Regions:
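Hydrophobic alpha-helix feature that most strongly marks membrane-spanning transmembrane helices
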Residues: 18, 46, 72-79, 90-94, ...
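C-terminal cap of metal-dependent C-N hydrolases
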Residues: 39-47, 112-165, 169-173
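Active-site neighborhoods of metal-dependent hydrolases
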Residues: 1-78
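Feature captures the catalytic cores and cofactor-binding loops of soluble hydro-lyases/lyases
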Residues: 60, 64, 68-77, 88, ...
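Acidic, glycine-enriched loop/beta-strand segments at the rims
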Residues: 27-31, 81-84, 94-127
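Short, solvent-exposed cationic patches
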Residues: 177-184
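Cofactor-binding beta-sheet edge motifs in enzyme active sites
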Residues: 66-70, 171, 178
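Short, well-structured alpha-helical segments that form the helix of a local strand-helix-strand
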Residues: 13-16, 82-90
């Protein structure tokens, strides 16, 4: 019966909503569908990789993690490209935004994450989307989780994520701060 009197795609969609109401769920790739085009853009020196959203939108959107996907695309190419992509995702944006250069050295405070290369080799961002209830928001939400891929996150050298959850340090001790606006 559904769709027998439908005249166009819009009317069909409305009839689906009328029939299934809140039980109707779907997903689609909205952008960045072609990996070669994405890689070309990520490597363009005139562009800076930007903000990536992994599911902050309540209920209706769950984007893949663009930074992990960028590393995955680079991994398909070579170790040298992984190193270059890491620079594109970290020090190049920092330089563009006027953040002080940071290196790794004795006595320096380090922010870093550990990515499991075997998990990265298998990573497909679109396949990790789930619809789950979030107590924090009191509703269901689309989320994109890359479990097992990030083995640890460290802020000022202190582990705040251990690969399966936040550590006791997270949210208890101040480890960072907001960036200051630069005068225009």
């Amino acid at each position: 019966q559904l769709g027998k009197s439908v005249r166009d795609d819009g009317e069909f969609f409305v009839s689906l909503l009328r029939t299934f109401d809140r039980d109707l769920h779907w997903n689609y790739v909205a952008a960045n569908k072609d990996p070669e085009v994405v890689k070309k853009l990520l490597l363009n020196p005139g562009l800076i990789p930007g903000f990536n959203d992994s599911g902050a939108h309540v209920t209706n959107m769950a984007f893949f993690d663009g930074n992990l996907r960028a590393l995955r695309l680079a991994m398909d190419d070579s170790e040298e490209l992984v190193a270059h992509m890491t620079k594109r995702l970290t020090s190049e944006p920092a330089e563009f935004f006027g953040l002080p250069p940071v290196g790794v050295g004795v006595g320096q405070s380090a922010d870093f994450l550990l990515v499991d290369p075997q998990e990265l080799a298998c990573y497909e961002g679109e396949s990790t989307i789930r619809y789950e209830y979030r107590d924090l928001f009191g509703c269901h939400q689309l989320v994109n989780r890359s479990e097992g891929l990030v083995a640890g996150v460290f802020k000022r050298g202190q582990e705040i994520w251990n690969g399966s959850g936040f550590t006791d340090l997270s949210g208890r001790e101040k480890l960072g701060g907001a960036l200051r606006a630069l005068p225009s």
